[in-house]
Amino acid sequence: MCRPIRFFAPIRLAVFAAFFTNGFLSGTWIVHIPRIKQVLHLSDGELGVILWGAAIGLFSGMLCGNPLIGRFGSRNLCGIAAIVLALVIAVPVLSPTPWLVFAGLLLYGFFSALLDISMTVQAAYVEKVAKRQLMSSFHGFWSVGGFSGVTFGGLLLHLTISPWIHIEICTLFFVTVAIWTWWRLPEVTEDQSNTGIQIAFPTGVLLPIGTVCFLSMLTEGVVADWAGILLRTQLGVDAATAALPYAVFLISMAIARFIGDRIVERFGAMNTIAVGLSTAVVGLLLATFVHHLIVVVIGFGMAGFGLGNAVPILVSAASKVGRPTVAYAVTATATVGYVGLFTGPVLIGSLAQLIQLPNAFLVVTAGVATGVVIVLGPIRSTFKREGAEKMSLHDPEPEPQDSLG
């Protein structure tokens, strides 16, 4: 399946670095959204239109991801996408006109999607070699990266440091990190079976898994792009304070993911997801309808903690289905998830024009509640029908002595 690897720890660290990079650069864009909305005098609807740039770019990247992995391998694609993403983040953040922001988001969405697909294939490979559940911890580093990006950006905004300086620091640092990551990642020869233009979309046993990923990541995208604006609209806070809900959302998500593997071992995958999504529903209701800063922050923290393990668990399950290949299964699941991540904020912007932003958040909350029903119904049935040997989140073989730990 793959070439021999001498040192597992540096490889796992490289995959962690890829997830951290993607999360940090995402947080770097997100922290500037309220500022850009104010500087460019955008309405909720106009901002929603601009965010279509990221959605279109993401969808294009998802369509290209599977054949590009087949052509170049997940290692090369991951390295190249990380370098380019660190460079193009400047365009949406620093552009002086709405249409340039839109164009920048096209590029950002495209390369973010390529990085996400390729790093997830790498993570699935490392998890398989290690013969233990690691996907939640990998995604935990994405959340830590996002939290770090939002916190660092919010601090610089508070200190009134120029966005140009902010972006220069981020670009220089993460281009360096991306080059090191590229050097350390392993070749996965199974990648080469993904030849030709093959659009990855979840069908059969992957369909309910992909649906819950869609709902979970849609909610994550809405919180990322609109939580700060909701806080500014309802409580009139400044730009730095507006970054607080998403920062707490991310750190709560990171905590959930770092303890998620142990929670799954103790309580089971489906119970973990169902209880988590239910917690997210309660948190979103608090954040939306209780107009107090502390309660809003706590509510978004509950939402982050509750959503934290849904996507990692389901992506790990999809990778173990592996039909027709691991890369295809992961790409198919990630595709619909990231469609939710990037189209959710766009749709909420349009919906907010019609029914007001708090009510639009209520629609999102209803979607999360629907996810609970799907987990307890079709997905649980799928796990039982497919059998533990294919859908189990843990390899039944004993862990080797030269594991990634």
Give residue ranges: language-model regions.
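Helix-loop-helix hairpin linking two adjacent transmembrane segments in secondary transporters
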Residues: L100, S137-P186
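Pair of pore-lining "gating" transmembrane helices in MFS-fold secondary transporters
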Residues: F8-H32, L106-L107, T203-T219, G301-F305
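Helix-breaking motifs and short loop linkers at transmembrane-helix boundaries and internal kinks
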Residues: H41, G73, L94-W99, G236, ...
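Helix-to-loop junctions at the C-terminal end of transmembrane segments
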Residues: G61-S74, L157, A256-G268, A352-Q353
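Primarily marks hydrophobic transmembrane alpha-helices of the MFS/SLC 12-helix fold
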Residues: R75-C78, I273
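Short amphipathic helix-loop junctions that connect adjacent transmembrane helices
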Residues: V31-G45, D225-T241
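Cytoplasmic helix-loop-helix junction between adjacent transmembrane helices
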Residues: G104-G140
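C-terminal transmembrane helical hairpin of 12-TM major facilitator-type secondary transporters
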Residues: F267-L314
